[in-house]
Amino acid sequence: MSHIRNFSIIAHIDHGKSTLADRFIQMCGGLSAREMEAQVLDSMDLERERGITIKAHSVTLHYKAQDGKTYQLNFIDTPGHVDFTYEVSRSLAACEGALLVVDAGQGVEAQSVANCYTAIEQGLEVMPVLNKMDLPQADPDRVKDEIEKIIGIDATDAVACSAKSGMGVDEVLERLVHTIPAPEGEIDAPLQALIIDSWFDNYLGVVSLVRVRHGRVKKGDKILVKSTGKVHLVDSVGVFTPKHTQTADLKAGEVGFIIASIKDIHGAPVGDTLTLSSTPEVEVLAGFKKIQPQVYAGLFPVSSDDFEDFRDALQKLTLNDSSLQYMPESSDALGFGFRCGFLGMLHMEIIQERLEREYDLDLITTAPSVIYELELKTGETIVVDNPSKLPDVSSVTDFREPIVTATILVPQEHLGNVITLCIEKRGVQRDMQFLGSQVQVRYDMPMNEVVLDFFDRLKSTSRGYASLDYHFDRYQSANLVKLDVLINGDKVDALALIVHRDNAAYKGRALTEKMKELIPRQMFDVAIQAAIGGQIIARTTVKALRKNVLAKCYGGDVSRKKKLLEKQKAGKKRMKQVGNVEIPQEAFLAVLRLDS
């Protein structure tokens, strides 16, 4: 056991976590040169295309150190985006240490701070590593200074390396073996293992990635899942080297997979404890705190025949991504679907794309909204995540919106633009600290403003240098109203929005203008209106296509022309009473792109 080291690699987006992982695999001979490719752990197509890590990946390698001992390294490559912090905190629970990778050119960014604090809270040993030393703009002294000032851990002897060229990587491994403590646990005690991740395989059933705390588990054992109380027979155990490799057993301190042909999707939930059926009284390990979704959106299959496939796909995806939550909902405009909860906009985009690719579905997404608290006149407090479910305004005494605390790290020259943006988004400044060449500002902002497009706008006003981390703080009263969209006098429930009263007129105008571009012209006029309660605040009209009925009249009396025009008018009027308007998918997403 003293030769096992479990650690995670944590960093901000694009600071080189996955590339460093590649070098480790290459140096320890996990894959042959033929199988090696860039970011070998990012196995999902989506991850390769976007160049980001979405799922945490686990790898077991054997490293022969300079002192002649061979160490078993179990490491987990984690995502860097704020939307996937749950993946990171789960990975950290399986480790004793973490490598904090910082880009020697960019310096410390918000996500490196946030992930590092998560690691320290969980009692891990954090070891700083300066990456990208081969870049001309690398400035190790400044960055070491930043690590000490901003994060507060000693970085005087941080290892400098370049994951791309391979320089200094062996030094990182040497230091790691000495810095990160060995796991504690007893091999002879009853089995106690924590499920860190699970996914569904069509042939094998549920595959679970576990960290064994005590005891051992081998093929043929009967394991008990503590939360369901069901017993399963283990088919195989093993590790990823990154290839799927079976081993004889998994012992205390190791991280590996267990396959027990569990066919029920909820048979082995993430964060659960496994033990042997002969020792059912083993304590449950502290799992992970259940994470609350921040953004809700409706997902509907384009054709209603796909509803059952959609439900199946969501179940399988939830097993793999336990931060996704969903419940059935129906809409007048879109039929049956699910209301899903996500951790942020990127998470929502990724989930929708995974559903469309991996499960071959066609989906329509409604505009995302956050959770609001309402206090009714009866005295009860209710939570609303869907604008179309809002009760009548007259019965509400207080409307509360979620406020997040956003921490932004930005170079001094872009500070002004960032502050202007935060004020535009109704932010209130908490504090400001000058740390070296960077400034850290903290703002309280409405979550509604942050989740939609704040991140993109922040990047563009600061030329890509600002970085953001945010977390939910509290609910606060606000002057909010529900903005309805009426098309030919009918409310379209899927287009309703909750907005601040000050922005309502502007948003209403922008939305009706946008809808006018997107709804195709019909044979009759289509009125698009935005309303708050009974008051119409904006209107545009999609003009009718009309035939020139006077084309055949040459000369002749004017009454003849009048007759033809009146006849056309009557026909259009009749059409308008019975005609209905098809709303294209783009129109539902118009709500997202209001500011652009």
From Swiss-Prot:
PROSITE patterns: G_TR_2
Biological processes per GO annotation: positive regulation of translation
Matches recorded under SUPFAM superfamilies: EF-G C-terminal domain-like (SSF54980), P-loop containing nucleoside triphosphate hydrolases (SSF52540)
Annotated compartments: Cell inner membrane
Chain ranges of the tr-type G domain: 2-184
Protein biosynthesis recorded as keyword: yes
GO CC, any one term: plasma membrane
Family: Belongs to the TRAFAC class translation factor GTPase superfamily. Classic translation factor GTPase family. LepA subfamily.
Protein task: Required for accurate and efficient protein synthesis under certain stress conditions. May act as a fidelity factor of the translation reaction, by catalyzing a one-codon backward translocation of tRNAs on improperly translocated ribosomes. Back-translocation proceeds from a post-translocation (POST) complex to a pre-translocation (PRE) complex, thus giving elongation factor G a second chance to translocate the tRNAs correctly. Binds to ribosomes in a GTP-dependent manner.
Record-given protein name: Elongation factor 4
Originating species: Pseudomonas putida (strain GB-1)
